[in-house]
Amino acid sequence: MAAQRVISWAHIAERDLDAIEEYIALDKPEAALDAIDTIEAKVQMLKLFPDMGKRGRVRGTRELVVAPLTYVVVYRVRGDHIEIARGLHGAQQWPGRIL
């Protein structure tokens, strides 16, 4: 049996998640927590399926699309460690530097 993978969130990814929650809460406060729960549940699936995201735009990363939401979780897999680098809206202009 494989070792349990560990997921960690970069500080900027945690801030991204907070910003997503705040933005959704502007129009639909009740939907904001549901959206965060959906994102976090999808990220937890990476423990079992670390390659489920497509190859990322940045070398060495993968991108997990969170459906039905339009958010993309950028992450890296290093052995049994999965680092969540960013959480971005699919339609937003991505920052010049992801990592």
Pin down the residues of each PLM region.
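Generic structural signal for secondary-structure transition and capping sites
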Residues: 22, 29, 44, 48-51, ...
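Short, hydrophobic secondary-structure boundary micro-motifs
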Residues: 33-34, 54-56, 96
